């Protein structure tokens, strides 16, 4: 194996590891969207981890690419149609909601240091 092909192999493996990590994290977060209670989520998360652990010892890079593509397709097929978004996060109901203060309210910047005549 030459130096260039070795570097290309390691770069491809690093990219695959990153794709698997991202896929697992997205699938785990989506599992939380489907679970109503935590005890259901824990069971589903354990099942998801087992699915990933089955193929962790595969060394063939082409087979790994096929497994990742299959996993991404399965994730897209089973994504939750209405995922939970926390209110203050982008896409949440309260994101960037800063109401203007009512008229007549003034801000005192030197609180406690006012001049008392």
Swiss-Prot record:
Record has Electron transport as a keyword: yes
InterPro entries according to UniProt: Complex1_LYR_NDUFB9_LYRM3, NDUFB9
Membrane topology label: Peripheral membrane protein
Residues modified to N-acetylserine: 2
One Gene Ontology biological process: carbohydrate metabolic process
Tissue/organ expression: Expressed in roots, stems, flowers, rosette leaves, cauline leaves and siliques, with the highest expression in the stems.
Phenotype reported upon loss of the gene: Shorter roots, smaller plants and delayed flowering.
Alphabetically ordered keywords of this record: Acetylation, Electron transport, Membrane, Mitochondrion, Mitochondrion inner membrane, Respiratory chain, Transport
Quaternary structure and interacting proteins, as annotated: Complex I is composed of at least 49 different subunits.
Family, similarity comment: Belongs to the complex I LYR family.
Summary of the function given for this chain in its UniProt record: Accessory subunit of the mitochondrial membrane respiratory chain NADH dehydrogenase (Complex I), that is believed to be not involved in catalysis. Complex I functions in the transfer of electrons from NADH to the respiratory chain. The immediate electron acceptor for the enzyme is believed to be ubiquinone. Is required for correct plant growth and development.
Name this protein carries in UniProt: NADH dehydrogenase [ubiquinone] 1 beta subcomplex subunit 9
Organism for this UniProt entry: Arabidopsis thaliana (Mouse-ear cress)
């Amino acid at each position: 194996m030459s130096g260039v092909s070795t570097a290309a192999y390691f770069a491809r493996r690093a990219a695959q590891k990153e794709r698997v990590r991202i896929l697992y994290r997205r699938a785990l977060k989506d599992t939380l969207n489907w679970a109503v209670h935590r005890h259901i989520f824990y069971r589903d998360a354990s099942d998801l981890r087992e699915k990933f652990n089955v193929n962790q010892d595969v060394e063939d890079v082409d087979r790994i690419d096929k497994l990742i593509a299959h996993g991404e397709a399965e994730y897209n097929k089973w994504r939750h149609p209405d995922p939970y978004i926390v209110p203050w996060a982008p896409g949440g109901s309260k994101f960037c909601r800063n109401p203007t203060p009512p008229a007549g309210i003034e801000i005192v910047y030197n609180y406690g240091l006012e001049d008392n005549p």
